[in-house]
């Protein structure tokens, strides 16, 4: 199984990475992200977060392979404003996203489809720049639904024009507290099911087809089952054990198309999270050329 990228708009130890990065100043911290872990997208290598006494939050993403954005690039952040991965969107429980492409700055909120799919007006306080390989975002906490003085979970995101992606941290979210030293809230039992999405695939007789799917879980871990159908009959079942899953990338299953295919083919994906919550079953066509 391999992965490919998912655009931003498609759409506490168990749920987030605690803010234990190197302290930069009062009410400020940051963390490093792996270098060269993306091919086409802006390669995020560091994220810093800070706030002032007036409630303005500033986030910076440092990328190693861009001085200025390239065509099709997106840089941004997704926020879990209530610090609860079991509410909000299926993307780690985030409720809001800010997306910057070098010329346009957009805001998205959780939609009825479970993703960050509803574009909303940009608050006046939200600003973004990209210069010297650093994307900087600033805004009033309350303008994005963050309670002043409290904290939030955040993930940095980047997407390239060819479909690659990077997230920081690589899995789950980073917890930041506006009051230095404050702990994140404790999480309750995980009762929320994952959300799966199969993507229409294309196959050529006798060759290997790539079957893409997304497995989105608030706490970022699923065991996945993929079933391939010829008509109504299951002809192959593929199972992956419970492991970390990133909702911003597509997981790719390889399947060799019969040399002389007849009839209709499709595949279906379903998942179970660490607490035993079962996802929806989502299916997509395999179009044989």
Show which residues each predicted segment covers.
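Surface-exposed, glycine/proline- and aromatic-rich loop segments on solvent-exposed faces
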Residues: 27-104, 158-167
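Short, compositionally biased P/S/T/A/G/V-rich stretches that sit at domain boundaries
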Residues: 27-48, 182-210, 289
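Extracellular acidic, Ser/Thr/Pro-rich low-complexity tracts
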Residues: 65-67, 143, 211-220, 230, ...
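Acidic/polar low-complexity flexible segments
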Residues: 83-97, 144-188
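Solvent-exposed serine/threonine-rich low-complexity stretches and specific carbohydrate-binding patches
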Residues: 90-113, 119-127, 234-246
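Aromatic sugar-binding surface patches on proteins
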Residues: 131-136, 245-254
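Surface-exposed, short loops/turns at beta-strand junctions within beta-sandwich domains
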Residues: 258-263
